[in-house]
């Protein structure tokens, strides 16, 4: 059975952030705390989005009045899955059970050689 790299995105709310950089750091740290020590192999990063006007890449963070919405990306390797859909379900289940109130969406599933 093949192995897969599953990429998920999540919307993370950060309260009392002093800056956009602060919000990004807090979001990654809080997500890491929820996943460790069980899933310390999951890579966590802030996602990117494109500017609607000039199409240049921007970090996926929106901040108003000290409250930020940070788009996080989770990358997880899933071994011995039956199909890409099965790998996505496994990754979403494993990450989701540690973050029950965080919305997760699968954005990519790629087979690993």
Curated annotation (Swiss-Prot):
- Segments passing through the bilayer: none
Any one Pfam family match given in the protein's UniProt record, by short name:
DUF555
The record's disulfide annotation reads none
Q: According to the lineage, what is the superkingdom? A: Archaea
> Mind telling me which InterPro entries this protein's record contains?
UPF0212
Q: Which PANTHER family match?
A: UPF0212 PROTEIN MJ0068, UPF0212 PROTEIN TK1194
Protein family (similarity comment): Belongs to the UPF0212 family.
Protein's UniProt name: UPF0212 protein AF_0282
